[in-house]
Amino acid sequence: MQKQHQRQHKVELVANLKSQFDSAKALLICDYKGLSVRKLEALRNKARIQGIKVQVIKNTLAHIAMKEAGCADLDLKETNVFLWGDDQIALSKLVFDFQKEHKDHFVLKAGLFDKESVSVAHVEAVSKLPSKEELMGMLLSVWTAPARYFVTGLDNLRKAKEEN
C-alpha cells in the first residue's frame, strides 16, 4: 500500500512538472552543492517575485517530465536545482546574479530556451541583455526625444526674442 501511494505521488509530480515545463519559455539547471538552505530560500524568494519557479527535483523524475514535455535531452547528474519561467532574460539575470554571489556553491550546468538546449555562454549573453522594462524605457526615451528637442528649440527662440 505504501509503495503504491509513493508511486502515485511520483506519477502526479511528473505530470505536474511536465505541464509546467511544457509551458515554460526557459528552464535552467544548476548545481547547488554546498549551498545552505537559507541561501536557497533567498533564491526562491527572489525568483517568486519575478514569477520564476525554483525546485529541487530528483534527476530521474525531471528527466521523465522533460522528455514528456518535448524538451531536448540533457544528461542530468549529481545534485540539481531546476529554475523555470516565461521570461528568458529575467531567469538568466537571476541565475547569473546569484551565481556571482555564491561562486563556489551555485553553478549553471545546462539550459533550455523554448525546449532547445543552449550553452552556458548563451545564457550568460542573454543575462546581459536589457530587461523588457528597460527596453520599454529606452523606446519611450527615443519616442519623446523629438518633442523634447522641439520644446527646447521653442524655449530658446523665446529667450532670444526677449533679449532683443
From Swiss-Prot:
The keyword RNA-binding applies. GO terms for molecular function: large ribosomal subunit rRNA binding; structural constituent of ribosome. InterPro entries: Ribosomal_uL10 (IPR001790), Ribosomal_uL10-like_sf (IPR043141), Ribosomal_uL10_bac (IPR022973), Ribosomal_uL10_bac_type (IPR047865), Ribosomal_uL10_CS_bac (IPR002363). The keyword Ribonucleoprotein applies. Keywords: Ribonucleoprotein, Ribosomal protein, RNA-binding, rRNA-binding. GO terms for biological process: translation. One of its GO terms (cellular component) is large ribosomal subunit. Pfam families: Ribosomal_L10. Part of the ribosomal stalk of the 50S ribosomal subunit. The N-terminus interacts with L11 and the large rRNA to form the base of the stalk. The C-terminus forms an elongated spine to which L12 dimers bind in a sequential fashion forming a multimeric L10(L12)X complex. Belongs to the universal ribosomal protein uL10 family. NCBIfam families: PRK00099.1-1. Forms part of the ribosomal stalk, playing a central role in the interaction of the ribosome with GTP-bound translation factors. This is Large ribosomal subunit protein uL10. It comes from Helicobacter pylori (strain P12). The gene is rplJ.
